[in-house]
Amino acid sequence: MKIFIDTANVEEIRKASELGVLSGVTTNPSLIAKEGRDLKEVVEEICSIVDGPISAEVISLEHEKMIEEGRELSKLHKNIVIKIPMCEEGLKAVSVLSKEGIKTNVTLIFSSMQALLAARAGATYVSPFLGRLDDIGNPGIEVVEQIADMFKIHEIKTEIIAASVRTPMHVLEAAMAGSHIATIPYKVIIQMSKHALTDIGIEKFMKDYEKAFGENK
């Protein structure tokens, strides 16, 4: 399973990229607004850091304007993926953009049926939201499993991006459920790298080395 980072914070992206684990980036209007910067400016800078799919979301809710925005965003860089919300207007936009060879990521997926429609409309990626489904008592990972099974049975090429990831356990569950990608906040990526026994082991190694080869030896 590939790892994307879910943020518009360039510094976080730079730090995560230095770990050598990133395959792409996802952003959304809320994340862009948090940075207080122009969308195109942020996206272009992200593209200079990560050589992989970079999802940039449209803000219009009418399909013709979505298409127009998508075309403009796609001109920024070859790695741009147009992120479009799951709705009737969004499906229309995905259908047109996909026929033009523009990659799309249908977001705000909360059911396997939504994912099927998005895939058939031509979406490159679908993004089911784990955390938000969990919040309403509907295990998000079950939806990911359903989508993965359905895509496999019907040989659908659309890739699954597990989104709304809040914990390392979400990442593990997504990987085991068959998600192609998990898009993860920076803090969760860092949490994934840590374990109490690792810290204890490192401390012991250092103490043992100092004891055997310290300055006074």
Curated annotation (Swiss-Prot):
A Pfam family matched in the record: TAL_FSA
Residue intervals passing through the bilayer: none
EC number: 2.2.1.2
GO-annotated cellular components: cytoplasm
Keywords: Cytoplasm, Pentose shunt, Schiff base, Transferase
An individual GO BP term: carbohydrate metabolic process
Reaction(s) this enzyme catalyzes, per UniProt: D-sedoheptulose 7-phosphate + D-glyceraldehyde 3-phosphate = D-erythrose 4-phosphate + beta-D-fructose 6-phosphate
Locations listed in the record: Cytoplasm
InterPro entries: Aldolase_TIM, TAL/FSA, Transaldolase_3B, Transaldolase_3B/F6P_aldolase, Transaldolase_AS, TSA/FSA_arc/bac
Single Gene Ontology MF annotation: transaldolase activity
Catalytic residues of the enzyme: K83 (schiff-base intermediate with substrate)
Alphabetical list of SUPFAM superfamilies matching this protein: Aldolase
Pathway assignment: Carbohydrate degradation; pentose phosphate pathway; D-glyceraldehyde 3-phosphate and beta-D-fructose 6-phosphate from D-ribose 5-phosphate and D-xylulose 5-phosphate (non-oxidative stage): step 2/3
Primary location recorded for the protein, binned into one broad class: cytoplasm
Domain of life, per lineage: Bacteria
Described purpose of this protein according to its UniProt entry: Transaldolase is important for the balance of metabolites in the pentose-phosphate pathway.
Sequence similarity: Belongs to the transaldolase family. Type 3B subfamily.
HAMAP family named among the record's database cross-references: Transaldolase_3b
Protein name: Probable transaldolase
Organism: Clostridium botulinum (strain Loch Maree / Type A3)
Lineage of producing organism: Bacteria, Bacillati, Bacillota, Clostridia, Eubacteriales
